[in-house]
Amino acid sequence: MARELFRTPIWRLDKFIEDQLLPDTTFLTELRADIDSISAFLMERCFQGAAHPVRVSRVVMGGCYNEYTVLKGRSEANMVVFLINLTSFEDQFNGQVVFIEEIWRHLLQLQQEKLCKLKFEVQSPKEPNSRFLSFKLSCPERQHELEFDVQPAYDALYEVRHFKPFDSSNYNKVYAQLTHECTTLEKEGEFSICFTDLHQSFLRYRAPKLWNLIRLVKHWYQLCKEKLRGPLPPQYALELLTVYVWEYGIHENPGLHTAQCFRTVLELVTKYKRLRIYWTWCYDFQHEISDYLQGQIKKARPLILDPADPTRNVAGSDLQAWDLLAKEAQIWIDSTFFTNHDMSIVEAWEVMPERQECVFL
């Protein structure tokens, strides 16, 4: 697959995405149906008859599962099981082992009842009292597989998620609680799944061309994982870099060339030591968390703040992982891959790796 991308003429990148990266529509239809069945099953069965008041309020897909940017082939995603009658992020952390065990028990029952159209396999926890649980939905005939990490979560947005129109001030109280608990518990960035709805909204109303560009970057990232065999920065960091490049390009270059976008993302990867990117969308410097946010953007780089969780630096702290990916990005930049049919070179846009003022576009 790496050769297929590398050998693709740069002016045919859009065609490559369409032919090689877009998922099979039949698989997507069956996947949505199975996810609905699993979600309904968990909402109906989990914690029924339990002495405590915790119940499943809803189930939301997150992580790399996104109907706008999901890839053909093998992918990973999150299934977030939101719980009501928790009162804090700390409640989520303290009860996670119990919640995981309950959900695992019912997923095994669902597997036995064979209600899914796709092949459904629950993975056994790797150790007793595990905080991790996963299952797979696959279609071997179409060579599609999606592995889900199941994560129970405090439904922090339960009371505000339906407010229309979108107004970031609705989240002031939630973010004040989040930053206080995260700093007290020393768990910054560990509750980002509670904001899965906002992660989805961040991409939902974007242009389809951006979704396809994210698919291309995700595909390149997977090729790097296969080749380099070492730890790499989180994939979501690359997705956010892609959004950042897009937001710049939509102003400067209304025509938006896929190859230029892609090259610019790779150029930013090579400048990882200077990255400081954040969005003032769900939170900003007018909120109660202004002082906290000021401290966040002064921290060591690379810094890519989660647009829905100001406590989470999506870039992580592994500089060796970034260095490994940056070297691979430079190999692609220096290669003939970005050569046009007239032998000219596709140039990157001059996008600053540090953003002075960020807004949601």
Swiss-Prot record:
InterPro entries: 2-5-oligoAdlate_synth_1_dom2/C, NT_sf. It is found in: Cytoplasm. Induction: Unlike other OAS1 proteins, not induced by polyinosinic:polycytidylic acid (poly I:C). Keywords: Cytoplasm, RNA-binding. Expressed specifically in oocytes (at protein level). Expressed at highest level in ovary with lesser amounts in intestine, brain, thymus lung, kidney, liver and uterus. GO terms for molecular function: double-stranded RNA binding; enzyme inhibitor activity. Its main location: cytoplasm. The keyword ATP-binding does not apply. The keyword Cytoplasm applies. Pfam families: OAS1_C. SUPFAM superfamilies: Nucleotidyltransferase (SSF81301), PAP/OAS1 substrate-binding domain (SSF81631). Does not have 2'-5'-oligoadenylate synthetase activity, but can bind double-stranded RNA. May play a role in the control of female fertility, possibly by binding to and inhibiting OAS1A. PANTHER family: 2'-5' OLIGOADENYLATE SYNTHETASE 1E-RELATED, 2-5 OLIGOADENYLATE SYNTHETASE. This is Inactive 2'-5'-oligoadenylate synthase 1D. The lineage of its organism: Eukaryota, Metazoa, Chordata, Craniata, Vertebrata. The gene is Oas1d.
